[in-house]
Amino acid sequence: MEFIKPDEVKLGEMKRIRFGTKADLWTGEADAEVAAKGLTHPADTYSLNGSLVGNAWKLTFRNGDESGTLNLPLPAKMLRYAADIHDGRTKPGYPEPVLYKEWRFEGEVKGTGFFKAGIVARTKYFLVFQGRGNSCDTAEDFTHWRLNITGKKADYTFHGELSAPVRDKENK
């Protein structure tokens, strides 16, 4: 586990990451209306379009005719986490274990549309990309994501899958 400043290599991999087309609102056993403080007209599932645009993750959520966008500026440092979870998985032809990996980002969030009412000063985001791979990080390693939004008027969590990353040549 280490805090790192994203270098050009990590930024290049981040630019290749694409969010899947669906985001689920985590509600536990509560109804969406109760579990999503600060989210106007919450739903269990949203359509989603998201990627790194400039120096911010831009995620646009849609539910029917309603939409909202979350802008998550890249922090100066991110947390890179990798662990051997001793499940015996290895990559064919390689002796080392396949690691469980996370990239974690935290910062202040900005929101529009159905997010706007709950996003006030100092509202925070916590974004996690999850996956498996060797000790070298690539966009292909990450398959799932989780996003928590917390603040004075907001408290909700989304999760979902990542789409296949953009090929390296398409990203330039």
Protein language model regions, located:
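Cysteine-centric segments in proteins
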Residues: 1-172
